[in-house]
Amino acid sequence: MAKITLAAARVNTGMTQEEIAERLGVSRATVIQWETGKKEMRPAYLYAYCHLTGFSEDDILLPEVSTD
């Protein structure tokens, strides 16, 4: 199976960034940072994100985190 980005996984399920944030107990800004590679996603959040979207960790293509 081809890898899918965090944003694509979320959109595929019809969820908004706000809905993901609410369910994970983080801010919408954090979800945006994960999706754009501005912040590294901790494994526990990745697991929960995958559970919400129906994808496995192996299906997700995480963006490279920028060090700027």
Where are these regions (language model features)?
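Short alpha-helical DNA-recognition segment
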Residues: 14-33
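A short, Lys/Arg-rich alpha-helix, primarily the initiator
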Residues: 1-12
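Key DNA-contacting residues within the recognition helix of helix-turn-helix
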Residues: 7, 32-33, 61
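Short amphipathic recognition helices of helix-turn-helix/homeodomain-type DNA-binding modules
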Residues: 59-68
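DNA major-groove recognition helix of helix-turn-helix/homeodomain DNA-binding modules
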Residues: 44-59
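Residues within the helices of the helix-turn-helix
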Residues: 7, 18, 47
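Residue-level detection of the helix-turn-helix DNA-binding "recognition helix"
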Residues: 11, 25, 36-38, 65
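Alpha-helical residues within the helix-turn-helix
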Residues: 11, 22, 51
